[in-house]
Every structure is written in structure tokens, then in C-alpha cells.
Amino acid sequence: VHLTAAEKSAILDLWGKVNVGEIGAEALGRLLVVYPWTQRFFEKFGDLSSASAIMSNAHVKSHGAKVLASFSEGLKHLQDLKGTFAKLSELHCDKLHVDPENFRLLGNMIVIALAHHHPSEFTPCTQAAFQKVTAGVANALAHKYH
């Protein structure tokens, strides 16, 4: 992902204030509510019958935190996202058979959760930078599909 110095600074400044567990839980929860067909990958998580059930589900919260921890690791390796996410790409492609479009959708949910929790810092320029990063991560996760 090519970022300007200002974009990289905006990302890292905001990321220093992010509660990974909170943002991850909200992003994954929103994905499952807004795009209900994604729930089929999480059937073992128990009750996903309503928005409130999903957003309060301990398994969703835990996995969301895990997902965002991986995303956070990617922020440390912006010049090698494909390498950073190679094993996860292989897992999601070969074993889990996740539609790679879901990575883009989840990236959008991360952006929404960041805007929700950090409204004053989440300027249009910061959003543009995060959109670049989430697109780069989605592309890296989809790499093994190509």
C-alpha cells in the first residue's frame, strides 16, 4: 500500500488510540448483521438470530478482537501485506472457502467502527488513508485465490 507520510501519520496516530477488542467486536458484529450470509462461516458461535444477539455474542467479540489484532499486525508491515497475510490467505482460501469479497466488506466495517468510536479524529483524509489500508489488506487476504 502506498501511503504519503501524512496518511501514514494519520493512521498510526489514530491507531494508538484504538481499543482493538472493541473495534474488532463491533466490526465483525456489523459484518454479520449487515451481510447475514457471512454468518454461515460462524455457525459454531451460537446465537446469531438477531442484531442484539450478534453484537453481544462472546464468540463474535473474541473473534473480532483476534481479527483486528491481525489487522494491527498488518499496520506494522504496510510494505509487505501479502507476506504478512499469506498464511491467513491460504487458510481462508483452501480450508475455510471464504468468498474474498467478504474481506472488502469487513474492511468497510472496520472503517465504520473507527468513525463511530473516534468521530473527531476520523477526518475525511484519515478515512481515505484507512480505506487504502483496508483495501490493501483485503487484496492481500485474497492473494491465494488468484
Swiss-Prot record:
Where N-acetylvaline occurs, the residues are V1
- GO terms under biological process: hydrogen peroxide catabolic process
Q: What are the record's GO terms for cellular component?
A: blood microparticle; haptoglobin-hemoglobin complex; hemoglobin complex
Any single GO molecular-function term of the entry would be:
heme binding
A Pfam family hit:
Globin
What residues bind heme b, as annotated? H63, H92
**Expressing tissues:** Red blood cells.
Q: Which Gene3D superfamilies match?
A: Globins
Name the UniProt key words of this record, in alphabetical order.
Answer: Acetylation, Heme, Iron, Metal-binding, Oxygen transport, S-nitrosylation, Transport
Q: Does the keyword Transport apply?
A: yes
> Which residues does the record list as N6-acetyllysine (modified residue)?
K82, K144
Q: Which residues carry this modification: S-nitrosocysteine?
A: C93
**Where is each Globin domain found?**
2-146
Its family remark reads: Belongs to the globin family.
Subunit structure of this entry? Answer: Heterotetramer of two alpha chains and two beta chains.
- Described purpose of this protein according to its UniProt entry: Involved in oxygen transport from the lung to the various peripheral tissues.
Q: What is this protein called?
A: Hemoglobin subunit beta
- Report the source organism: Cavia porcellus
Lineage here is:
Eukaryota, Metazoa, Chordata, Craniata, Vertebrata
